[in-house]
Amino acid sequence: ARSHQADVTGRLVDALKQIDGAYSLVCVADDMLIGVRDPHGVRPLILGKRDDTWLLASESCALDIVGATVVRDLEPGEMLIIDKNGVRSEMPFQQVAPRFCVFEYVYFSRPDSIVEGRGVYHARKAIGGELASESHIDADLIIPVPDSGVPAALGYAEKSGVPFDLGIIRNHYVGRTFIQPTQKGRTDSVKLKHNANPAAVKGKRIVLVDDSIVRGTT
């Protein structure tokens, strides 16, 4: 099907109205930079500025790295058009219920990012503290599954008063294991990626904290 809209932004809106799902889209067309966040706001999209230059990124830490300032999050269903005249905002989609993905706070976003106005690192520590309040058992040490389980484990340790230690050592030269196509591949990669630290864990009662359990491989 071909859109009958006269301009690029109109055609883009026509195309996106056919999609019911999660996206944060950034594209360059003619002399414009266009950013669109899906109507449910499942994924974040952030506007930043460095001097006279406008930027769009999926995480605030990307703006920090290039010396830009975070201006604001795009609203669910918002389209930003950036051109030589500046920035203009449009809300071209029908308003629907927000469905922000909680996994941004749990796993997807970097700990040094701010998502929807809240720091990811502190959100993860708070989740760990809440877990300690709800489900604490007697233990000698709180151990994280590195690296993404570290903030939650710190929060758990602070809330419970049980010492935190590094009982699992991560090999940072092994790539992503979660996205391996087969279970055998994921299992083999985890064996290379993580190793128990006997000096820390031998003879100890351990509470092991991870950010989430999807397949249970780690």
Question: Which residues does each PLM region occupy?
Answer:
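Short, flexible loop segments at the rims of nucleotide/cofactor-binding pockets, characterized by
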Residues: S3, G119-Y121, K184-T187, S212
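Secondary-structure transition/capping motifs at alpha-helix termini
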Residues: Q5-A6, E134-D140, E158-D165, P198-K202
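Flexible loop/turn segments at secondary-structure boundaries
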Residues: I34, V42-R43, L63-D64, R88-S89, ...
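Extended, hydrophobic alpha-helical segments in both membrane/secreted and soluble proteins
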Residues: I142, G149-Y156, S160, F164, ...
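Short, glycine/charge-rich flexible loops or terminal/linker lids adjacent to PRPP-binding catalytic cores
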Residues: G161-V207, T217
